[in-house]
Amino acid sequence: VTSRNKGEGATMRVELITNSQQAVRKERVQEWEERAERITENAPPRIQRILDVASEKGSSVWLTALSLKEQGFNLNKREFRDAVKLRYDWPIDDIPSICVCGDTFTVDHAMICKRGGFVIMRHNELRDLEAELLNIVCSEVQVEPVLQDISGEQLNGGSNRAPDARLDIRGRGFWESQRSAFFDVRVCHPNADSYKGLGQVYKIHENEKKRLYARRVLEIEQGTFTPLVFTTTGGMGKECVRYHSRLAELVAIKKGEDYATTMSWIRARTSFVLLRSALTCLRGSRLFSQPI
């Protein structure tokens, strides 16, 4: 009996110590969060935006991921330095002052300038990645499927009625068994002056995509439509977060892996695609080569 009492006493002491340590850690985390919030509130608007962007879920995945070359998770020295400077909006000195399009060349301009085709490449690489991931869990995955023609259906005024309208990806059985799910990708730059907050950035682009395609997909294709809105800094809109959560769940079940590991892998893949695209927009040549 004495031995049992001693054992129970030791267990209680361990639990007490553990609970105390957890309480202290929780208090410290809360203190740091409150301190960070105060700093953010008192910072200039531009700094507030940088801090908000840097703290978004998924925006720092490339910093914490293992540098696995076979997964494409490695960066060379200049790429890493550029990535850190982009993340914190630090000055980058060795870039042109004027873009080939004639505008002043800044980081913000580099992310949206269509000369050189980097904006289209960024979109297509994300589209292809999402299609690749959907192929793991869906049947009949198509890239750029053509939508069926409109034949008398009543659509909202903003719908895309073009006879050759396409969306980025179609897969069967994602949200519901045997039902077609359509997805359309958009990448936006969150530092545009017209945006007031990150929530507004995502809402604007998601609503625009839904206005163009949601009713047509629902009424004619009898499918579901999900806009996948990303930012150049690695963030995602609510619809995109919900989609990736479902994707990770399905992939984890299919591969027999745990959800957290699968989600981390998916986030890392999307994070590095966005990061490499941003680095290409910053450093890539926008001059068209002349035939020899």
Mark where each language-model region is.
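Acidic carboxylate-rich catalytic motifs and surrounding loops in phosphoryl-/glycosyl-chemistry enzymes
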Residues: V143-D149, G223-G234
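Active-site metal-binding core of divalent-cation-utilizing nuclease and nuclease-like domains
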Residues: N74-T106, L129, L133-D193, Y202-E208, ...
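Short Cys/His-based metal-binding microdomains
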Residues: P96-L126
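Short glycine-enriched, charge-decorated loop/helix-capping segments at active-site entrances
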Residues: G116, G197-V201
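Extended C-terminal regions of large enzymes
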Residues: V1-Y88
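Domain-level recognition of nuclease-like catalytic cores that cleave nucleotide substrates
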Residues: V229-I292
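Short acidic, S/G/P-rich loop/turn micro-motifs used as interaction or catalytic elements
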Residues: V1, C188-N191, T233-M236
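Arginine/glycine-rich "motif VI" loop of SF2 helicases in the C-terminal RecA-like domain
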Residues: R216-Q222
